[in-house]
Amino acid sequence: MNIHVTLVRQPVSYLLALLVAVSLSACGFHLRGSEALPPEMAVTYIQSGNPFSTLVDDFAAALRARGAKVTERLEDATAVLRIQENDTERDVLSVNTSGKVLEYELRQTIQFAVATAENLPIVESQTVSMSRAYLYKSTDVLGSEREKDAVRRTLQKSLVNMAMLRIGSTTR
C-alpha cells in the first residue's frame, strides 16, 4: 500500500511543479539577474574614476550574470557603462543621553550612463540612491566596523541591482 501511494504522489508533485513553473513564466516573472540587457551591451567596458573599486566589480558581476561579456579594453567594447559618480555619506541617526552615538545611517548615491561604442546613448545619465541604518556599539568597535562594512556591501549590491533593472527596462 505504501508503494502505491508513493507512485501516485510522485507524478502529482511533478505535475504541480510544472504547473507552477508555467504559471510564473506566463505572468512575466523573472528571477533576479535574468533581466535582459540591450543587445548593444553584449561586450561592455566599465569606465570609472576608480577602476579597481568594489562598485566596478559588482557591476561586472551583474553584467556577466545577465549574459554580457565585460572587457578591460575600450577598443573591444560594443557599449560603455560610465560610472559618473559614487558618493557615500554617513550620518548620525541617534545618540544616548551621554551624547554617544547609538545608530548611524549610511547613504550611497551612484550616477551612471550607458552608451554604444560610437557614443550613442543607450541609457541617459541616471542617479540611484539608497540608505541603510546600523547600530553602533562603542564597547565593540571592531564588531561595529564589521557591521558597517556588511551594510555598505549590501547597500552597494542593492544599488547595482537597481541600476541593472533600469538598464534592462530600456529593452522593452
Predicted ranges, named:
Residues 3-16:
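Bacterial N-terminal signal peptides that target proteins for export
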Residues 22-26:
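C-terminal motif of bacterial Sec signal peptides marking the signal peptidase cleavage site
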Residues 28-31:
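Bacterial signal peptide processing site
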Residues 40-47, 140-144:
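Acidic/histidine-rich, surface-exposed loop or edge segments in extracytoplasmic proteins
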Residues 42-87:
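N-terminal segment of the mature soluble domain
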Residues 63, 67, 114-118, 138, ...:
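Sec/Tat-exported extracytoplasmic proteins
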Residues 76, 82-127, 131-146:
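Surface-exposed short loop/turn segments
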Residues 142-172:
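C-terminal/domain-edge helix-coil "capping" segments
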